[in-house]
Regions:
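Active-site donor-binding loop signature of nucleotide-sugar glycosyltransferases
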Residues: 4, 46-48, 77, 123, ...
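Short phosphate-binding loop-to-helix
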Residues: 24, 30-75, 79-92
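Conserved core of the sugar-phosphate nucleotidyltransferase
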Residues: 82-175
Length: 175
């Protein structure tokens, strides 16, 4: 709770204040669904078997029958302080072949890097997100952590945008 209101209700308000044409909450929780509906949010119920939030988003996009060219901004339910300017900027930074994007910045301190509350991303040289983890990846045996990134954005420098490509593991088709 933040000043007597749930975090997710604040995220719903934030998303509604953006330029997004549609807002959907993807969840597997009836409790979250009921709570979000009390704020007039659209809710898509998804499987509880997902390994990651991106898997949940891919399922929600399939349920909603969204065309691949529709940009999807993944605003986490625990990000009530994301600047709305960033939410509004992200669709313009997506490529037509990669409709889902996560922004990332380099960690500035070891405390955040070690925190399981901060998501880490491994990026390819071309800045494509390869995978995410709440643990430090790869594990450092020396205790020195250099070149680690977190899914967020440096609003002043679009150099840190990571695109993501999703594949259907059954037949290796792009989602």
């Amino acid at each position: 709770m933040i000043n007597g209101r749930s975090v997710i209700s604040r995220v719903i308000d934030l998303a509604n204040s953006s330029n997004a044409s549609n807002l959907y909450i993807a969840t597997d929780s009836n409790e979250i669904m009921d709570h979000c509906k009390s704020y007039d949010a659209n809710v898509v119920m998804t499987s509880s078997d997902h390994i990651s939030g991106m898997d949940r988003i891919a399922e929600a996009a399939r349920i909603l029958d969204l065309p691949l060219e529709i940009p999807i901004i993944n605003l986490q339910g625990d990000e009530p302080f994301m600047p709305v300017q960033i939410i509004n900027q992200l669709p313009m930074l997506l490529s037509k072949d990669t409709p889902i994007s996560t922004a990332s910045i380099q960690f500035s301190n070891a405390i955040d890097l070690s925190s399981p509350h901060e998501v880490k991303v491994v990026r390819s040289i071309s800045k494509k997100a390869m995978y995410f983890s709440r643990a430090v990846i790869p594990n450092s045996f020396t205790g020195e952590y250099k070149n680690y990134w977190t899914p967020s954005i440096d609003f002043e420098s679009n150099d840190y945008i990571s695109e993501q490509i999703f594949y259907n593991s059954k037949d290796d088709t792009k989602i």
